[in-house]
Amino acid sequence: GMGPGMLSGISRPEEIRFNVKHIAISRGASFIEDLVVRVDPARKELQLQGGRRVAYDVASFNTGSGVPVDERISAHEAVVPVKPIEKLLDARHRIIDALKQKKLSIVVAGGGPAGLEIAANLRRLVKDAAGAAEITLIAGERLLAGFDPAVRRRAERGLARLAVTLIEGRKVEEASGRSVRLTSGESRPCDFLFMAVGVKPSSLFRDSGIPAGDDGGLLVNRFLQSVTHPEIFGGGDCICFEPRPLAKVGVYAVRQNPVLLQNLQRALVGGELIPFTPQRDYLLAFNMGDGTAVVRWKSLVFDGRIGFALKDYLDRRFMKMFQN
């Protein structure tokens, strides 16, 4: 997404969000600003945090995911989960203020795409603020472990160019005060700790007695429909796709939307549902914060300014579909 770019200042907050309430109301929908805390599939009702209960004939869930933070880490004075995205904007302001006082030690935990982009864009933030910081990426087993060696090599070169220290084979085990301890026993200074260790759906579905996958996501069939409750559907990060595991990337959520729309309408009238067929190849572009990106498209891997220009164009074009 565009979150790391907002952290660095490449994108403004208003450029990476759209007004869901306005969109819903303008199309004749009701908008309720509240949190669903439990689903009652027997009564076909949603229980909201504010106490209200909302009945449904069909329901679609896109409740997203969050970053699980161990209690031994959450005690740190300045831990920043990379989701929800508002956390990044708050961290940006706090880092800019802190840089006026001293050189910072910033640690990013997580060697996936999010960790890579956060670490790289932190360097841009520090540079533009005319400050100084030691930035360390603790990548777990290895950086971008599930990717081709060509992608990893370009990412590693990019981090070296940005003077980001990469540590592999270790994880952040504990954090307190102004330091973190790694699984190797090593302790490192840390003023800000960004947690990018993967995402996990909320416990909503398990708490409601609805079948869920190993990570707690709503277990759905190829129609994006609950395997036990045919009136319940879902998409994005909050589902577990029974036919095969799906990476938690935005392209799947975007492609699931028209399928969900069709199937919700068809379910209301007893029509035949249409399957979601996930693509196996999709464009991946990692924003390196310096106007370049590492790009993978099928077997093609490249990096540079053209890569970032492509990513930026696609991201902004998508957002403008809903902002206009």
Where are the regions that the model predicts?
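FAD-binding core/adjacent interface of flavoenzyme oxidoreductases
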Residues: S26-V107, F194
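C-terminal auxiliary extensions adjacent to catalytic cores
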Residues: D290-N324
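N-terminal Rossmann-like dinucleotide/flavin-binding domain of flavoprotein oxidoreductases
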Residues: G1-V58, D148-T165
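Rossmann-like NAD(P)H-binding beta-loop-alpha module
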Residues: R92-A132, I138
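A Rossmann-like FAD-binding core segment of flavoenzymes
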Residues: F31-V39, R124-R222
